[in-house]
């Protein structure tokens, strides 16, 4: 496993990129972890298959690390997938799009956040994050055939109105964004949050197998079985 690399220059972006490979049947999950309070310790995931096709989920601020990794490993970026439209999960969209011209996908009810700095909460961070890349919207149950294994879209309105999870059934992997976090859940007091829809959204996740591996938008990975035991919200 390659050593974690940390910038030693105050002029460069402060980032720690974890090249920890998780082999799960037909796919490999590579977490890119951006450790900076300004970006709320957001996680980015690169998922690739045996044919060197890959997708990036929630590109945070580790722009060059993602680009370098994809180029160094001769990967073909098929798509940029967004679990929701908050600024800390979409900052890297334009950089990746300009580098690879990959399709961008987001939940239908979160599409407005890509072009609205209030809705995507970047104004709260004293910034104005806007995505210029073209994008397509996703609906519940939609299947994406981007990798060797299909990716299913599960809508989970709660943290935002258009939050979605990405589920790879054969590998039993779920990318939850800020819906489920390690031993907790995302906030429900931000613009477009739908707290009243939490239980209906959670019921979709609870229907998945207990051994489902969970990769959230912040924090460490977990499993649905563990979250059922220790997370008071996963009931």
Where are these regions (language model features)?
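Short, charged, surface-exposed secondary-structure boundary motifs
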Residues: 41, 114-117, 184
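Short, low-complexity intrinsically disordered segments enriched in A/P/G/S/L with frequent Arg
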Residues: 2, 11-13, 19
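Active-site neighborhood of phospho(di)ester-bond hydrolases with catalytic His/Asp-centered motifs
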Residues: 56-57, 78-85, 104-107, 155-158, ...
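Generic short N-terminal amphipathic or hydrophobic helices
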Residues: 15-16, 26
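Conserved beta-strand hairpin/beta-sheet module of binuclear metal-dependent hydrolase folds
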Residues: 25-73, 165-177
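Metallo-beta-lactamase
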Residues: 120-123, 143, 150-235
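Active-site HxH/HxHxD metal-binding segment of metal-dependent hydrolases
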Residues: 61-145, 230-233
């Amino acid at each position: 496993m390659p050593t974690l690399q940390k910038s030693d220059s105050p002029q460069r972006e402060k980032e720690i990129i974890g090249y920890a490979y998780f082999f799960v049947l037909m796919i490999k999950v590579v977490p890119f972890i951006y450790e900076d309070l300004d970006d709320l310790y957001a996680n980015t995931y690169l998922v690739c298959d045996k044919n060197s096709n890959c997708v990036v989920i929630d590109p945070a601020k580790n722009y060059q690390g993602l680009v370098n990794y994809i180029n160094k490993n001769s990967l073909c970026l098929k798509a940029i997938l967004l679990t929701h439209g908050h600024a800390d999960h979409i900052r890297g969209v334009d950089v990746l799009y300009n580098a690879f011209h990959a399709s961008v996908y987001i939940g239908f009810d979160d599409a407005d956040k890509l072009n609205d700095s209030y809705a995507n909460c970047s104004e709260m961070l004293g910034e104005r994050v806007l995505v210029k890349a073209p994008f397509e919207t996703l609906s519940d149950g939609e299947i994406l055939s981007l990798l060797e294994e299909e990716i299913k879209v599960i809508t989970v309105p709660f943290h935002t109105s258009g939050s979605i999870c990405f589920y790879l059934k054969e590998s039993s992997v779920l990318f939850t964004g800020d819906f489920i976090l390690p031993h907790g859940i995302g906030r429900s007091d931000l613009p477009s949050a739908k707290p009243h829809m939490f239980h209906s959204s959670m019921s979709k996740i609870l229907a998945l197998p207990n051994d489902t591996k969970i990769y959230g938008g912040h924090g460490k990975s977990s499993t649905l079985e563990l979250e059922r035991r220790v997370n008071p919200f996963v009931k």
